[in-house]
Amino acid sequence: MAKVIFVLAMDVSGKIASSVESWSSFEDRKNFRKITTEIGNVVMGRITFEEIGRPLPERLNVVLTRRPKTSNNPSLVFFNGSPADVVKFLEGKGYERVAVIGGKTVFTEFLREKLVDELFVTVEPYVFGKGIPFFDEFEGYFPLKLLEMRRLNERGTLFLKYSVEKSHR
C-alpha cells in the first residue's frame, strides 16, 4: 500500500488555520513545495482547495468532496470516496506515496481509518487564540518516532518528521 504522509504547518498549540493572514513562513512554503512536488500529488478537502484558489502546479491535486465536479484540468480531480478509496485511486495511477495536506476534516478521516504512515509538521512560532485544530477527536492513539528535526529560519520555525510506529499502523 502507498505510504500516506500528512504535510502540514501549525502554530505551537496545534492550530492549522487562523484569521491571521500569511502566517506560514517563506521557508515552510518552500519546504512544502519541495516535499509535495517530489511526492507528485496532494490530497485535500474542498475548503482547503477553495482557500488555495487553484490547483498546485507540478502535482496531481485530488480534492475530496461529497459533490464532485468534472474538471478539464488533468492535474485536478474531484473525488467522492473514503480515504482508503483515494489511496487506491492514487496507487492505480502509480503513486507510491500520498501527501495529505488538510484540512481538519480530511486529516480526521484519515486518522479514523488509521491511514497515516508519516507526519511532516512545520511548527511556526505563533500562538493563535482562535483557529482550527489539526484534527477532531477520534478513538485510539498513534505512537510516533521522531525521524528528523530541522530549524528552518532564525525566527524559530521548526520542521519535524515523524513516523507512526509500525505496531500501530
UniProtKB/Swiss-Prot annotation:
Q: Which InterPro entries match?
A: DHFR, DHFR-like_dom_sf, DHFR_dom
Thermal behavior of activity? Highly thermostable.
For this record, an example GO cellular component is: cytosol
Oxidoreductase is among the record's keywords:
yes
Keyword Oxidoreductase assigned: yes
Question: Pathway, according to UniProt?
Answer: Cofactor biosynthesis; tetrahydrofolate biosynthesis; 5,6,7,8-tetrahydrofolate from 7,8-dihydrofolate: step 1/1
Q: Name one Pfam family in it.
A: DHFR_1
Highest taxon of the lineage: Bacteria
| Annotated substrate binding sites | 7-8, 28-30, 54, 59, 101
Q: Which UniProt keywords apply?
A: NADP, One-carbon metabolism, Oxidoreductase
Q: Domain DHFR spans what residues?
A: 3-169
Similarity comment text for this entry: Belongs to the dihydrofolate reductase family.
Q: What does this protein do?
A: Key enzyme in folate metabolism. Catalyzes an essential reaction for de novo glycine and purine synthesis, and for DNA precursor synthesis.
The subunit structure is: Homodimer.
Specify the protein name: Dihydrofolate reductase
Q: Which organism is it from?
A: Thermotoga maritima (strain ATCC 43589 / DSM 3109 / JCM 10099 / NBRC 100826 / MSB8)
Q: Which gene encodes it?
A: folA
